[in-house]
Amino acid sequence: MEVFKALFKSKEAYTVDVDPMKDSDEHDLPRDPLSIRVTGEEEVNHIPYPYFDEIPTEEEMKKKSAEFYKSMKKRRTVRKISSEPVPLEVIENIVRVAGTSPSGAHTEPWTYVVIRDPDLKKQIKEVVEEEEQLNYARRMGEKWVQDLSILKTTWSKPYIETAPYLILIFKQVYGIKPDGDKKVHYYNEISVCISCGLLLAAIQNAGLVTVTSTPMNAGPRLRVLLNRPQNEKLIMLLPVGYPAKDAEVPNLTRKPLEEIMVLK
């Protein structure tokens, strides 16, 4: 605790921003060190690692890792998504996988908002496209727009309505304790990004497709539309479904192993 007293010398009380269109950030956390909950190992019951009997042999490990890579290298960004229904159980299992992700101090600072209501999807599309038109016209710059045009990316996002499900991933900038006080969420953005990676792998494993969308400047409006609290900030929007019959993807290649891995 002495370390935290040194780091947080200010005793001034925190205030809650009353503007619903402004996302919270770490500056909204309490500055009093005594209000920060520190979780020590002595507070968590530890048990022996329970999965020793499931560790594969080296040959099995090689096979499993190769098969997983074979599946994942087929993952592509797909912008034409079919409206064909997907069982809700599949989506729930995909989100469960994302929820197994590690997080700073086990705070699990993520919220996955799953949308299947057509009217709500339409409203989300209207918000995103309105902001995207401004992004492409003014905010992004000519070079950025040119780089995206090579991939046939525009402000139009029809997949938001056609996909049977949308998954909006929010990071919890801080937590709320039962008594209403704020709780630090360490490395919240890194934690949520790791979770998003597992989510994408789970989508691919289920045989579905998506496109990673980060709706620039639309986050606060979508948070308010979805009635999410101010301590949450939109990180990513994923339409999820089957590829449409006329779906196309850029004919791209990925960097070889020798360009992405360094062995010392």
Swiss-Prot record:
Specify which residues bind FMN according to the UniProt entry for this protein: R75, R76, T77, V78, R79, S103, G104, T212, S213, T214, R254
Gene3D superfamilies, from UniProt?
Answer: NADH Oxidase (3.40.109.10)
Tell me its EC number(s), please. Answer: 1.21.1.1
Could you tell me which CDD domains the record lists for this protein? iodotyrosine_dehalogenase
Q: Which cofactor does it need?
A: FMN
Keyword Aminoacyl-tRNA synthetase on entry = no
- What are the GO BP annotations of this UniProt entry? tyrosine metabolic process
- Catalytic activity annotation: 2 iodide + L-tyrosine + 2 NADP(+) = 3,5-diiodo-L-tyrosine + 2 NADPH + H(+); iodide + L-tyrosine + NADP(+) = 3-iodo-L-tyrosine + NADPH; 3-iodo-L-tyrosine + iodide + NADP(+) = 3,5-diiodo-L-tyrosine + NADPH + H(+); L-tyrosine + chloride + NADP(+) = 3-chloro-L-tyrosine + NADPH
Record's keyword terms, sorted: Flavoprotein, FMN, NADP, Oxidoreductase
Q: Does the keyword Nucleus apply?
A: no
Question: Which positions in this protein are listed as binding 3-iodo-L-tyrosine?
Answer: A105, E132, Y136, K157
Q: Name one GO cellular component term.
A: plasma membrane
Any idea which GO molecular function terms this record carries? FMN binding; iodotyrosine deiodinase activity; oxidoreductase activity
Function of the molecule: Catalyzes the dehalogenation of halotyrosines such as 3,5-diiodo-L-tyrosine. Likely to also catalyze the dehalogenation of other halotyrosines such as 3-bromo-L-tyrosine, 3-chloro-L-tyrosine and 3-iodo-L-tyrosine.
Q: Which family does it belong to?
A: Belongs to the nitroreductase family.
Could you tell me what this protein is called?
Iodotyrosine deiodinase
